[in-house]
Amino acid sequence: MKDYNTDMPETHGNNTSPTFHIGSIPIYGDAILSPMDGFSDWPFRSICRGLGSAMSVTEFVKDKFIIHALEHIERRFKYDEAERPVAFQIYGDDPDELLEAALRVQELKPDIIDINMGCPAKTVAHSGAGVGLMRTPLKVARIFRKLSAALEIPVTGKIRIGWEDYRSYKLIARIVEENGGAAIAVHARTKEQGYGGEANWDVIAEVKAAVKIPVIGNGDVKVAADIERMKAYTGCEAVMIGRAAVGNPWIFARLDRSQVPPEAVRQMVHQHLERHMAFYGVRIGMMLFRKHAMQYLKLQRLPRATRTRILLQENAEDFLAALDEIYTGLEIQSETSLRL
C-alpha cells in the first residue's frame, strides 16, 4: 500500500542527476516550499521536504536580531541534516549589517544564505528592507557584492515585480547576478498586490531571459499540474509553493488534496502536531498548530460545525480524539464508495 506521508515523488526522489545547481550546491527536484513567516518553521519544512520539496528555506530573520539577540531567535534556524540543502533567509536594509548577520549565521552551517527583497509588509518594506530594497538598486549591488565576496556559501535573492510605480525586477535580477548572486526567486506580484490578485508569470519569463543564473518562479501555483505549467510557460528551473502547501504538503509529491485518502490526512495531522509540540512545547505547539489544522480540515470540505468542534478542543488529546472520530467515519465512507 502506498504511504502518502513518506513516499517521495518517483520523478524526483530517485534522481541521480541534479535538476540544477545553486552555486556548487546540487538541487534535486523542481518544487520548493516557499519561505513564509509563521509557517515555514522546522516542523512544516521537514514534512514538506520528506514529501518531495527540493530544499528547505527558513522563515526570514531581521539582521539586527541576529547581531544583537541571536540566542533568542536561533530556533528559526533550526534544521536537521535530512533537510539539506538548507537556505537561511535574512532581511535588512544596511549592507554592512546584513554582512555581519550573514557571517554569524554562516557558523550554523547552512548551505545557502538568501536575502529577502520581496516582503510587502509595511513594517518591513517602508523601512527599506524586503521589497523596499527594490527601490535602491545601488544598495542591492553593494549587499550582494559584499556577501558573495565574504561568505563561503552561495548567496541568493528573492524578489517581487517591484512597486506599482517602480517595477525594477529585471534591473534587480541583473544586479544580483552581476554581483555574485547564485540564483534568484521571483514572486510574480507587486508590492501593492501583496498575496492577492493574479500573478504575472510573464515577469518570471522575462527574468529568465535576462539572467543566466537559475530562476525560481513563485505565485499562483495552486495545484500539482501548475508546477509543470509554470516551468513550461516561463522556462524557470524550479517553482516555489507557499500558501497552496498549507493543508496540502502532498503537492510536493505531485498530489492534489482530493487525491489524498482521509486516513493519510489523519496520520499527517497527528505527525505534524507531534512535531509542533516537540519543537515549541505542548501548550504553545498546540496553539500555533491551529492555523495548520484549519487548513487541513478546510480542504477536507468538512461541515463548518464539524471543523469548529475539532478546532475548539483545548488540549492535544481531545483535539486528536475528535479528529480521529471524524476521520474514521470518512475513511469508512471512502472505502464503501470504492466498493460500490
Predicted regions and their residues:
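Active-site beta-loop-alpha junctions enriched in small/polar residues
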Residues: 36-38, 61-63, 91-93, 118-120, ...
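Short glycine-enriched, charge-decorated loop/helix-capping segments at active-site entrances
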Residues: 128-134, 256-259
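Glycine-rich, positively charged N-terminal anion/phosphate-binding segment
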Residues: 4-21, 36-111
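Alpha/beta enzyme core
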Residues: 99-129, 138-213, 233
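N-terminal small/glycine-rich loop or linker at the start of catalytic domains
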Residues: 20-32, 64-85, 119, 124-127, ...
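Alpha/beta catalytic cores of nucleotide-metabolism and tRNA/nucleoside-modifying enzymes
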Residues: 1-23, 27, 31, 37, ...
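Hydrophobic faces of well-ordered beta-strands that scaffold small-molecule active sites
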Residues: 31-34, 56-58, 86-90, 113, ...
